[in-house]
C-alpha cells in the first residue's frame, strides 16, 4: 500500500479505492482509460498527448467534509460506515489526504462542539442539531473556511457565545458560518448561510491570480494540481491572436482570469465574457478581476448553454468550457460547432461525457490533450484539451 491508512486496511473507509495500486500504475491506468475514450478523435501526426501532471500522494486536499456522530461530549468527525446506523461513526481526523494543519484543528472543533452544546444529529431518531462540519483551507495564507451544518438556528446563541474563543484559535482571516439544512435527508448543505465573521470569503492564490472561495461554491480540491491546470491553459493560448473570448461554466474564474491576464499583457483591449450560473461564484470572480485591475471583462450569472444559444454578438476567437460531470451537452456542443470560433479549450472531470460532446464538435480537430491527476488513489482525473477549427 502506497499510503499507510488504517481505515482502508480495516475497510472502514474505502473512498480511495486504488490505495493498493502503485502510483505509477494508477497514472498508467488513467492514461489508458483516457486514450480509449478519445481514440476516435486522436489524429496521427497532429494530436499531441502530453505527459500527465502528477499529484502529491498525501496531504493534497484542501477540504474536509466530516459527518458528525457520537455524543456532544465525545463527537466523532468522519463518516458513517452504515448510513442508517448513527452508532457506526468512523473518526477520520487522521486521514492522510488532509493538510497537516487540520490535525491540530480537529481537537479544537471537538471542544467547541461540546462547549456550544451542538448535539450530533441522530438519523435514526431524527434528533440532534449538528449534521456536518465542512472545512476548506487556503494554501496561500492558511486561512480556514469553517461551516457548521445544523438542522436549525436553535443553537445559534450558544455558538455565538463560544465564538470569540474559537476564533482566537483559528488562523487569521478565517471565515465561520452556520449552514441550515432542516431536511431529514443525506443532503450536505441547505440554502441558508449565516456568516458569524465579517469576512465571507477566504483568499487562495494560483500563479499570482487571487481566487476567492465562498460557501456553497465549487473550488478544486487539489490546489497544487489545479494551479498547474490553469497555468497550462494560459500557456497554450497566450501567443494566439485573440481579441475576445468566452469562459463558460467559469466558476470563480480560474481559467478566464489566467488567460485574460496573459492576453491583456500584450493587448489591453482583449475582451472576456465569463458565464456561471452561481451568483456567489460570479461575485468571487468579479472581486479577483478588480484586484488584478483587468479591464474589458463582463461577468454574468446565467446558465452557460442559455447564454451561448442566445448570444448575438460577434463570434469569439476562443471559447473555454469547464462543465460539471454531465458535460456541456448536445445542444451547446452543436451550437459551438456551428459558431466557428477558431479555438476551443475543454477541461473535463469526466472524459466519458467529454468524448460524447466531441462527437458533436465535428468541425474541430483535437490538437492537445493532457491528463491532470486531481484525484489520486481513485479512478477519477481531470483532462485539459485544446481543439482547433478545421480549415
From Swiss-Prot:
GO terms for biological process: rRNA base methylation. It catalyses: uridine(747) in 23S rRNA + S-adenosyl-L-methionine = 5-methyluridine(747) in 23S rRNA + S-adenosyl-L-homocysteine + H(+). It is an enzyme of class 2 (transferase). The keyword Iron applies. It holds the Pfam family tRNA_U5-meth_tr. Coiled coil: none annotated. Keywords: 4Fe-4S, Iron, Iron-sulfur, Metal-binding, Methyltransferase, rRNA processing, S-adenosyl-L-methionine, Transferase. Disulfide bonds: none annotated. The active site is at residue 349. S-adenosyl-L-methionine binds at residues 220, 249, 276, 322. SUPFAM superfamilies: S-adenosyl-L-methionine-dependent methyltransferases (SSF53335). [4Fe-4S] cluster binds at residues 5, 13, 16, 95. InterPro entries: 23SrRNA_MeTrfase_RlmC, MeTrfase_TrmA_AS, MeTrfase_TrmA_CS, SAM-dependent_MTases_sf, U5_MeTrfase_fam. GO terms for molecular function: 4 iron, 4 sulfur cluster binding; iron ion binding; rRNA (uridine-C5-)-methyltransferase activity. Its EC number is 2.1.1.189. Catalyzes the formation of 5-methyl-uridine at position 747 (m5U747) in 23S rRNA. Belongs to the class I-like SAM-binding methyltransferase superfamily. RNA M5U methyltransferase family. RlmC subfamily. This is 23S rRNA (uracil(747)-C(5))-methyltransferase RlmC. It comes from Actinobacillus pleuropneumoniae serotype 7 (strain AP76). The lineage of its organism: Bacteria, Pseudomonadati, Pseudomonadota, Gammaproteobacteria, Pasteurellales.
